[in-house]
């Protein structure tokens, strides 16, 4: 049976894992790393780079290197968080025809689902390379506090990447699965997940294979990216004070600042001080300018203290919703790269009154949990029951714009709930059902997920028709809503798709684009491999010809030289043809065989001569020494007498 993989699609980094026997194994990517930067870049010549190769060239290509795309997924362009993000990134965020936030690179627009799909494709290829077989099914994680539009957009990304997404699972829940799979005794745990772009807190009861989420809370726009930007702003303002130049207007300088900020942040988790050194960051009439600054851990902590404090209110809300006090939490599990920061750990310790558990790898535990859930769905992992919750209340807009809840937040999913409503006016023949998600009392203040009309209601006084509205949330946390006129039996049902969101036709087009790109990427890779092999063969052939050319006839030598020249010409062409390079590589290999044979024969002859000389030496060395006695002749005896 084909394996189902688990993918942690992160804001900053992504990770893929698979069940290996009874354990979840994190798979290394082509670059040998266990996590992959969630970055996609488009180069001048149309090449698409994903992961570490994209990150490496970000400084020289900031406008076409897309990162932290997860923060835009499922969001509209007018969303305040989108507008905030616009000022934080060097690439363009644009308004799509449907009002969604899309991104632009080299004058081409992409949906966040499309860019996320490119990262998912990379994770898919990583798994396929390790497993040696095709991968078509996956479990993908999302922040627990993602709304329906964001979950749907993530599922769309999986589809575009060629994956059948069996389950969307919340990141803290996945982490709890990986942490508690072998725990038999009952425990109440809190998972504090501060990642690259989002913050989640979940309270769970775990024990003997049952994982029940009691509550969840969070902030989908709070994470490591904000910590980095806070430091970037500080560095830019200090530089402006010293040099009078605003680096924020220079996208290339801004990208260098961002990389330096991320590096400094990581170093300050283990050191009390770090030095930021950026030579030639900019220039003016007086010449080049350099940025050099010492930064202490205490200064960095003061810059980001309010961001850390923003995690406290969601933690308190989650504890309240779960009906437990901080003292009743047996263990606090830290997840996400930002939890390596000592100040974050100290804040968690103060809040919960205990040392947080650091026994899991915060970068890998979510992907491992996704792989365990994949194992559960596949039947490889037995006796595990996972009960998750919906993070936000769901309801409809009723008379006066009031938000009427049908499903309260932290309700265990899957779930189904119905409620009967009526008309607001006499002889009303149609009603518009406006579905929202959130915690505010007025519908306009919550996230509108979608709307639809129920038509054909028979004329009747207001309040008489009975319209039953049913909400159905599946295990992925994705909502389906239906409305039924109980008098006529007429029903209208929709899977909620955000007022923006991708249509099925758009998704299908993106799937085809992704497949075409995968084919183009494969051809490009084959071309590079063919070129590398050709250049290596040219080098070795020229060297062999130089050293041993006198061992073959003039005709053979000329044939090799011609083949080398032809292959060089193919490699150096303005648009190299992989098939042409392969054919000319084979030709050179064939004509070089005579040279190789001559070298081999010459070596054999030399070896034979060497063996003969050695044998001769050995036979000379075998002469036996004889004992002898000196005998004097007669004359000698006479002379001595």
Swiss-Prot record:
SUPFAM superfamilies hit by this protein: Actin-like ATPase domain, Heat shock protein 70kD (HSP70), C-terminal subdomain, Heat shock protein 70kD (HSP70), peptide-binding domain
- InterPro entries to which the protein is assigned, alphabetical: ATPase_NBD, Chaperone_DnaK, Heat_shock_70_CS, HSP70_C_sf, HSP70_peptide-bd_sf, Hsp_70_fam
The residues forming a coiled coil are none
Q: Which UniProt keywords apply?
A: ATP-binding, Chaperone, Nucleotide-binding, Phosphoprotein, Stress response
Explain the induction of this protein: By stress conditions e.g. heat shock.
Specify where the region named Disordered lies, as residue ranges. Answer: 514-554, 604-641
Start-end of Acidic residues biased regions: 622-633
* PANTHER family, per database record: HEAT SHOCK PROTEIN 70KDA
**What is the recorded name of this protein?**
Chaperone protein DnaK
Name the source organism: Sinorhizobium medicae (strain WSM419) (Ensifer medicae)
From the broadest rank down, the organism's phylogenetic lineage runs: Bacteria, Pseudomonadati, Pseudomonadota, Alphaproteobacteria, Hyphomicrobiales
Which gene holds the coding sequence for this protein? dnaK
